[in-house]
């Protein structure tokens, strides 16, 4: 008959008893107890240990916990906070009468500050939800040189493969009288180039990903990949408030959202976002040095050929781009798994020693013991995502404001240029 090795709860001496025996007596100190009591005591100690880890402060006897993931209400709050902060910042600029010259140092500082609103909204959400932003937004992951190179390649192929679709969409808008004035990148010197890289690539890449993927998409993860990626990409597109960028922002939002969902590593999205902005900015700057001004280069990006022919060409190139991006994303996911491990919830087990071999005797769900497979299934069923009326209201308010703002900006370009 197999024997289980344990320790005496009174003196700590090594014990052994035959499986099936209920009573156990320590030969060293004479203490007597049952194996059932031992199991119950061990579970009680584990619960107390978990409480000590979770307990950071105690106010009026209430246990304060730090969560490690966002829910859908956090996504809604993130949208509302972004809208509220944007309105507040606009009011401040209007009241103070601050005006800056395009391309000046103050302009790029202001641009970086505006981009910082995304990050500030994410921080406020984390604080209000008592959630660790670093863990919930998956900022505790690592990257290496291969990941950086693959992120650059994905951004480049995305721009080459899907950029023509954006141009066709702009041609379509222009056909109906849409004005592209003020919507192109203008860089006249090296310092303006550095300013654009800092504000539009570094700050924007981090701040926007922190909110859109780290908070909004993370809050939708329990709803499945299609909902999480699709909704975050849609909000990402609308929040930019530019009809010119509609197609591009939607495509890049889906692309980055998919990578984040599969890897649970925010830094991959930040890198792809950075290079997605860095490549066209660098292209415009180099071309302006070689032969033409950036304004002339930008002017040539629309109105070439008929819309129909351009669309056919764009779709063919987009299909090729989709094929190569799939290959690159698979390599990126594999490299991320090599550096950080697979993207799955940690499974913890407790074990006792049986004839010198470790045997799993307890299953846990998110750190809590599940006694049977039936309990595990019931717990999973209970995790079916739901949405409250308050969350729906927050999404509705933020969404309505953003859509109206987007429509006003778009219509004004049709009517007044």
Where are the predicted features?
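Cys/His-rich metal-coordination motifs, chiefly Zn-binding "fingers/knuckles"
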Residues: 1-48
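Interfacial transmembrane-helix boundary/kink motif in multi-pass membrane proteins
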Residues: 56-83, 132-163, 345-347, 368-400
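Hydrophobic alpha-helical transmembrane segments
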Residues: 76, 80, 109, 148-153, ...
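Alpha-helical transmembrane segments in multi-pass membrane proteins
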Residues: 81-127
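Hydrophobic core of alpha-helical transmembrane segments in multi-pass integral membrane proteins
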Residues: 83-90, 116-124, 155-160, 310-330, ...
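Functionally important transmembrane alpha-helices
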Residues: 87-92, 238, 245-314, 323-327
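Juxtamembrane helix-loop-helix connectors linking adjacent transmembrane helices
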Residues: 102-108, 134-204, 403, 407-417
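Function-critical hydrophobic alpha-helical transmembrane segments in multi-pass membrane proteins
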Residues: 160, 182-246
